[in-house]
Amino acid sequence: MCGIAGILREDVDLREQEQLLCQMSDSLRSRGPDDSGRYLEPGAALLHRRLAIIDPAGGRQPMRFGDLVIAYNGEIYNTAQVRHLLESAGYSFETTCDTEVVLKAYHKWKAGCLEKLNGIFAFAVYDTRRGTLFAARDRIGVKPLFYCKKGRLFAFASRIPTLLLLPEVEPVVDRSGLAEIFMLGPARSPGHAVFRDLAEIGRAHV
């Protein structure tokens, strides 16, 4: 289990948001107590908290390959097979972790990489040249990934409390989301969150 988060915006220099980024990272500590990392530029920040299981030395995140930076949480069951396909296509690997496999799978197949991956995951890939973000979850939706899109702000995180740290997000309960909790018990409709301005990337969605 790991924790990921990120912010994209053009109206604020994120390099000047050190306190906010530290708070967001700290809020994910329960999902990744072993290590923390970040990628930061004026308009984008990716955060990662790691529970180190595979390749503790080589699997630090966010991980970069060319123009792409990934923050990843998950487990790929067919890592060896996907890695073999990529090696056959000319890719080489510096680590034994599945993060590098997912990153290079996206580099090779873009969104089509999801058809190759068998596992449970939530990840986001930021293209530093184009300034775009690709985020996705597994088919079952085991790994959580929530997001906020408000004005010129887009942010995502493994946990709702992480997004509630954003000054633009007020901790106001969404009445329809709360009604679902009361009617369905602990369940809720896929893609919904309990707080206003927040939503969840649906299972098998990008």
Q: What role is predicted for each listed range?
A:
Residues 1-203:
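Cysteine-centered catalytic environments shared across enzyme families
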